[in-house]
Amino acid sequence: MSFVVIIPARFASTRLPGKPLQDINGKPMIVHVLERARESGADRIIVATDHEDVARAVEAAGGEVCMTRADHQSGTERLAEVVEKCAFSDDTIIVNIQGDEPMIPPAIVRQVAENLAASSSGMATLAVPIHDAEEAFNPNAVKVVMDAKGYALYFSRATIPWDRDRFAQSRETIGDSLLRHIGIYGYRAGFIRRYVSWAPSPLEQIEMLEQLRVLWYGEKIHVAVAAEVPGTGVDTPEDLERVRAELR
């Protein structure tokens, strides 16, 4: 099947300045992400960045770059700029991989594209089971609940669904009902155009989760359990050291 990968790579980062260019065993992090995307079988891969140094690193690795504005408020807004500059047709399937995911399995990049192609929704994403109690109650681990057909009912930093009887007894065991959302998305290009035309929703502003805008406006997001659990993303210097060790 045909799909395009877009990798937003913003240079500024509060916790890890210059994050896309951080060295991981001799290569910039963004190049590791580019290589994983190539293994997914995507027809085209574009790195969207606002920084010339990132662009040079990607081009040196044989990658395609789209320069974007630095003032975007979200990753989806950056995608929308690329969609317009590249004049993608509305039915083009776009997979968004974060530029700080050097260990993302190529199989799940293709999985989210295939799931979207088989769905009637404009957007698709993935999740993985939560087995650890600490993760279950961690607001940085975003949870998702789905309906019987695999469409998202809600995403939250809170622990959902709340297992009333189990958690009343103990929060050390969490059962098997919790799913952690993975930040990989598939979109139809036309859906990205619609998304950025909507005003931000109250729920996304409360939870700080931009995907809630989609549910607020009555649209559907397809969710599936990922075929592989992705490795560590890079948000902090500690994450970076962990990834360096795992990829050594």
Swiss-Prot record:
Pfam families registered for this protein in UniProt: CTP_transf_3 (PF02348)
Keywords: Cytoplasm, Lipopolysaccharide biosynthesis, Nucleotidyltransferase, Transferase
EC number(s) given by UniProt: 2.7.7.38
Primary localization class, coarse: cytoplasm
Location in the cell: Cytoplasm
The protein's name in its UniProt record: 3-deoxy-manno-octulosonate cytidylyltransferase
Cited PANTHER family: 3-DEOXY-MANNO-OCTULOSONATE CYTIDYLYLTRANSFERASE, 3-DEOXY-MANNO-OCTULOSONATE CYTIDYLYLTRANSFERASE, MITOCHONDRIAL
Catalytic activity: 3-deoxy-alpha-D-manno-oct-2-ulosonate + CTP = CMP-3-deoxy-beta-D-manno-octulosonate + diphosphate
One Gene Ontology term of the molecular function aspect: 3-deoxy-manno-octulosonate cytidylyltransferase activity
Organism: Klebsiella pneumoniae subsp. pneumoniae (strain ATCC 700721 / MGH 78578)
Gene3D superfamilies, A to Z: Spore Coat Polysaccharide Biosynthesis Protein SpsA, Chain A
One GO term (biological process): lipopolysaccharide biosynthetic process
Broadest EC class assigned to this enzyme: transferase
Pathway in which this enzyme or protein is active: Nucleotide-sugar biosynthesis; CMP-3-deoxy-D-manno-octulosonate biosynthesis; CMP-3-deoxy-D-manno-octulosonate from 3-deoxy-D-manno-octulosonate and CTP: step 1/1; Bacterial outer membrane biogenesis; lipopolysaccharide biosynthesis
Function: Activates KDO (a required 8-carbon sugar) for incorporation into bacterial lipopolysaccharide in Gram-negative bacteria.
Entry similarity comment: Belongs to the KdsB family.
GO cellular component: cytosol
